[in-house]
Amino acid sequence: MTTKRSLFVRLVPCRCLRGEEETVTTLDYSHCSLEQVPKEIFTFEKTLEELYLDANQIEELPKQLFNCQSLHKLSLPDNDLTTLPASIANLINLRELDVSKNGIQEFPENIKNCKVLTIVEASVNPISKLPDGFSQLLNLTQLYLNDAFLEFLPANFGRLTKLQILELRENQLKMLPKTMNRLTQLERLDLGSNEFTEVPEVLEQLSGLREFWMDGNRLTFIPGFIGSLRQLTYLDVSKNNIEMVEEGISTCENLQDFLLSSNSLQQLPETIGSLKNVTTLKIDENQLMYLPDSIGGLRSIEELDCSFNEIEALPSSIGQLTNMRTFAADHNYLQQLPPEIGNWKNITVLFLHCNKLETLPEEMGDMQKLKVINLSDNRLKNLPFSFTKLQQLTAMWLSDNQSKPLIPLQKETDTETQKMVLTNYMFPQQPRTEDVMFISDNESFNPALWEEQRKQRAQVAFECDEDKDEREAPPREGNLKRYPTPYPDELKNMVKTVQTIVHRLKDEETNEESGRDLKQHEDQQVVNKDKCVKTSESTTTKSKLDEREKYMNSVQKMSEPEAETNGGNLPVTASMKLSGNLKHIVNHDDVFEESEELSSDEEMKMAEMRPPLIESSINQPKVVALSNNKKDDAKDADSLSDEVTHNSNQNNSNCSSPSRMSDSVSLNTDSSQDTSLCSPVKQTPVDSNSKVRQEDENFNSLLQNGVNLNNSPEEKFKINDKKDFKLPEYDLNIEEQLVLIEKDIDSKATSDDSRQLDHINMNINKLVTNNIFQPEVMERSKMQDIVLGTGFLSIHPKNEAEHIENGAKFPNLESINKVNGLCEDTAPSPGRVEPQKASSSADVGISKSTEDLSPQRSGPTGAVVKSHSITNMETGGLKIYDILGDDGPQPPSAAVKIASAVDGKNIVRSKSATLLYDQPLQVFTAASSSSELLSGTKAVFKFDSNHNPEEPDIIRAATVSGPQSTPHLYGPPQYNVQYSGSATVKDTLWHPKQNPQIDPVSFPPQRLPRSESAENHSYAKHSANMNFSNHNNVRANTGYHLQQRLAPARHGEMWAISPNDRLVPAVTRTTIQRQSSVSSTASVNLGDPTRRTEGDYLSYRELHSMGRTPVMSGSQRPLSARAYSIDGPNTSRPQSARPSINEIPERTMSVSDFNYSRTSPSKRPNTRVGSEHSLLDPPGKSKVPHDWREQVLRHIEAKKLEKHPQTSSPGECCQDDRFMSEEQNHPSGALSHRGLPDSLMKMPLSNGQMGQPLRPQAHYSQTHHPPQASVARHPSREQLIDYLMLKVAHQPPYTHPHCSPRQGHELAKQEIRVRVEKDPELGFSISGGVGGRGNPFRPDDDGIFVTRVQPEGPASKLLQPGDKIIQANGYSFINIEHGQAVSLLKTFHNAVDLIIVREVSS
């Protein structure tokens, strides 16, 4: 107990000389893991003046402690105190009291007896009100009550006239008592993140106020009386709804930092130029159309951020701001810059990303101190020759996909102006289709998210020493230092990250659904894959490297329109753009089909493709560190994609503005990285992966555009891959084929076609084996593969070789998948490639997507493939297709790769989650939880070459730690998860006699059975990816949930398991396990936990995504009063200070999972959770009040048991008593939106689209869980708990593949008439139709189905995903072509009367 005690004594001579005892005045027992106050303290009670008991686990204070009447300072932050004893009144000499980060609900009334108390720190406690006696602490000078539950302050609060610092951030305050006008000595007032709708009038009297925070409220205007605060130097009113700033503000003559970011300003007051001392003005993310001429009066300004507005021109007076050092105007509509801008002699950082600039003024050559300039995504034709004078310029970004910060410039004479200019291969820049917002009725995406993604994609990542801090750190609050509140910013950031991840996960979920369909086909292809595996094993690395190189080239080319000259490159360019939008596209391919048939198709594609990958990367970066073995390679692929995702997250958080630059860079990098990771990196050895990641990370820091980052990491990956692979050409060919396939699929795919595609995808993956497929079918399958990740399978060099043999150019597909950053290449042909890929990183990718897809995906796969809308593919890939033809050059292949990769990325994420959801792929429920996996025996179904389950094998989970074992048990089968490196393994897995009836889950188990460690790794890797990245979690399928649960445990446990064991269990595991393995798999693949390169991400991502629970597993203490609930400040918080991550069993990164973990301590304490947590266990274990956590757990557990009596079916052999996740077992009906809270349903996808509410689709819903429902906003804890319960209740036990998600509920068809008003569009997306790519809900149905509904759109309350449209405005939609249905819906004016058929659970 006293080991860490430090005794500080007054400076006195040595007691040996004095012959007397020294006087102990200070004791420090901080961080000693104490559960009670040490008794030895009381021996010094007469002399003790300062006592530090910080960061222990003390639950109550002994009475003796309050006999220490000499005590001046009592420090008890970060403990488990629930009450403050009334006897504290005995400490009459107490001056400083710190009880922050506990579970204290109220102060005792008699605290008023502590007359000399001057500093009280009580932040992060569930304090709902202050006692009246509190206002009698007349000597109080500093009061910190951040992050509590205060709704009001005592009426006589104004008695505290000596207050100098008052922090009340993150409460629920709506007003201040009028008596506060007496607080004339108040210098700092923080009212941020409360519920104020107007600035309290009492502020006008606080004449001494210097720093004022009121960000994150609901203000609509800034009153002029703020101008009376003449001493005010810092004013933060960002993140409100401010539409007007009154002119009286101009009298704040000492104002230095003025933050107006993220409001609704349309103009600034003309008097703003009177603020002569302002050094920082942030007006980004508003609706400004111009800056007033008076802005030139801000003579002292050094930083001006007006990014994300609608400014078309800058006033010439801006040239008067001669002290300007950082200027950001990203994402505006600037067509030219005033020549006066050359007067900025001190400018060092200039951000002009994403505008409409065609020329730059010569005067910019006078900016002698300019170090970083971002000119990407404009319409520049050249650069002024005066740029040669910029001697200090260290980074210049000219395009979205630039691989290096500086590129050689050549002198040329401009034909129009006859002036000497600088140009290079990147000019002329052309605007990206991304600028066009989607105008499709069928689109269902979140504009805000979309905008956020745009920001992310468009960021330049420069590592400029001078401005690095500005960009990477949150916006500076001047030089002000806030009191070091114990409330950890990391937690808030984590919450934000989780939100982002959740959004992405949802996007991924959608994508994964598509991927699943493909996966089913992939299962079929698995056998062929096995044949190709050996080849791919040897060649995959090289091929992947080649692919990466190609991808990089394509990316670079993509950035410039000139890329079009290269057949391959042009598509790549489109793909890159798509990669930005790809996430959306993959997930919303159908939506895009209709909506994107428009010009925005390409954009959407890119966006869709990119975000999902990025999302995956975010959570999966940990996986980056993979072993050098092929197994590791497979992991690498996943980890790479994870890494990409991670980067994308950063990008999302940071946009153009300097403060956001670094993040945005990551985003861009992510998309490219994802691609590279998926394909080349996966195949590359762990070392190369780590290097690549490091490079990526470096690039991220260096290139804030993120464009560069993407390319360079990918290039490196690709280079490595090339080294590994010898079939770069094949990759290209594959890409070409993929493009073709995409076309075919888009134009021809019917539900049958979709199935065919799925089969074809499998065949294609097996290219060598099935060369016979019709070209159309092959093309389609390629498309699907790409979307699903089959392409990734193809990507493996061996596979490529095989593909070449078949005569299909699937190597290109492979490349494409790689481009996506998913190892979808592998996944698409799980059956065929599994064995082959087992040894290569590609395998991992395949297993992920394949797993998801393979479960009976063949039927619905078409639908998933359909998700790839032709339009989208065409935008990015069709050109490539034309260019590529069958023998397109490698660059075209790269382009195709990108497009398909993008799709694939999306698919990969969606694959496991969505596909599983889609199909009754109910992976074995047993896999649902790690504990289940651990304890339960699972029946592994072996599949023959045709992917038919041969006979269930009952496999007892390995005795590995719960989490790990669980993975071993079958979760939803991870089709590609455990591809073994050798064909023999494959044989083991597949038995000739397989029952097609066996659950899709069963099929995956077959794949899973592959014993190859490489396969295992791939499986794990995918899991890890899923877990790490939200997109993985987005998967609603049970497998997904299982993985989620298992992942944390697995993460830790997998390390311990031998590679072989892992493989076998991995096989047993289903997609879920694989997902859960993601974190663990990453480690598993590495073979050692230390390996996780993603460690960086781990801390964050793991916490939230896969390791989230695990990371915080130890911490039972609430981190904050609100337990950092995802909810906004208003959401209710748990009673306990903070839930432990450990409590959150859903290690899954699924959207809902994130929500749970955020809000509810844990659904139930699972052994798996424990182990998982232990894996990620961070030091900061905190205990939530036992009551709260246990109640929640019991509540959830009980609900689960109530609602999900396990109904095991043959397919459920793997099923444990617990379901991996509530999500896992949702019956399709149960998953319908109506069961979920709106917030969940509306969760934005990472893509930037709103995650469609849970799909009510009969088949889908089962796999599709609320997690898919977007949690655009963090739901309140109660909501989360309910949501979890809902999920649990709806999780249907796994059943045979034939059993539809209906297993839980009988579905009745109901015909409904609805009227949708266009505003401005219909707000939903469709798929299917006689030429469509299939219907994700009913692959065998050629009807038109609703696939997405825009959460806030006109159809949000009328339609649900899965609704079949029978008639629209009198036009029959039966046996109608997809394109015709889209065009009809688009041509209808105003309103559309629809007759739909909805399946309702009876």
Swiss-Prot record:
Record-annotated PDZ domain positions: 1311-1400
Phosphothreonine modification, residue list: T485, T914
Region of interest (Disordered), ranges: 465-489, 507-543, 629-694, 824-864, 990-1018, 1070-1093, 1107-1187, 1198-1217, 1222-1274
Modified residues (Phosphotyrosine): Y483, Y917, Y970, Y1097
Assembly: Interacts with ERBB2, BPAG1 and ITGB4. May favor the localization of ERBB2, by restricting its presence to the basolateral membrane of epithelial cells. Also found to interact with ARVCF and delta catenin. Interacts (via C-terminus) with DST (via N-terminus). Interacts with NOD2 (via CARD domain).
Modified-residue entries (Phosphoserine), positions: S440, S444, S595, S599, S600, S617, S712, S849, S854, S869, S928, S1150, S1171, S1276
Gene Ontology molecular function: signaling receptor binding
Protein family membership: Belongs to the LAP (LRR and PDZ) protein family.
Protein known as: Erbin
Effect of P315L: Decreases interaction with NOD2
A GO CC term assigned to this protein in UniProt: nuclear speck
Pfam family, one: PDZ
Bias kind Polar residues: ranges: 660-689, 1070-1084, 1128-1139, 1149-1164
InterPro entries, alphabetized: Leu-rich_rpt (IPR001611), Leu-rich_rpt_typical-subtyp (IPR003591), LRR_dom_sf (IPR032675), LRR_R13L4/SHOC2-like (IPR055414), PDZ (IPR001478), PDZ_sf (IPR036034), Synaptic_Scaffolding_LAP-MAGUK (IPR050614)
Biased composition, class Basic and acidic residues, residue ranges: 470-480, 507-534, 629-638
